[in-house]
């Protein structure tokens, strides 16, 4: 059997890809933990979330720069285009809020990093359940692709993403 790919364009020379690992087991490299300086990062999922937080910050800067460029262009039609640029981020936030609604968690939209509010408390992604972390890793990985073509390789060791 095997795997086959159909490329578009046909003369493409590379595939942009990302890997999602959803194992929630403890990190073994204590040297790595010391380097990042975040005591909340304890598992492989936490590590993925940590890396995705950095990519999310870059994503926000990039879309912010594109919005500024459009708004300062002097072209009236670019105002509508500028508003459209932030739609994927808003869709992501709405989707996460909907998926986590049973637990009362909502994304703090005014925060630069991913944080949640639940019953007046502020939560980091590291405080989420394993299934919530897995879902957040998947959705964040898709968001930070910034509408660019990408192949995602993903394992699924647990049933929790189905719930």
Task: Indicate where each model-derived feature is located.
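Switch/communication elements of ASCE P-loop NTPase nucleotide-binding domains
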Residues: 91-163
């Amino acid at each position: 059997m095997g795997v086959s790919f159909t490329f578009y364009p046909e003369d493409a020379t590379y595939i942009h890809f990302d890997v999602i690992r959803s194992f929630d087991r403890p990190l073994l490299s204590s040297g790595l933990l010391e380097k990042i300086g975040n005591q909340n990062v304890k598992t492989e999922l936490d590590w993925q979330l940590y890396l995705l937080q950095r990519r999310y910050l870059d994503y926000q800067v990039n879309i912010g720069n594109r919005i500024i460029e459009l708004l300062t262009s002097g072209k009236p039609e670019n105002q509508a285009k500028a508003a459209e640029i932030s739609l994927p981020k808003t869709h992501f936030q709405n989707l996460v809020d909907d998926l986590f609604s049973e637990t009362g968690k909502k994304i703090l939209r005014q925060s630069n990093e991913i944080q949640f509010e639940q019953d007046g408390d502020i939560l980091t992604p590291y405080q989420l359940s394993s299934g919530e972390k897995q879902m957040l890793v998947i959705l964040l990985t898709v968001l930070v692709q910034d509408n660019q073509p990408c192949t995602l390789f993903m394992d699924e060791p647990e049933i929790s993403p189905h719930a």
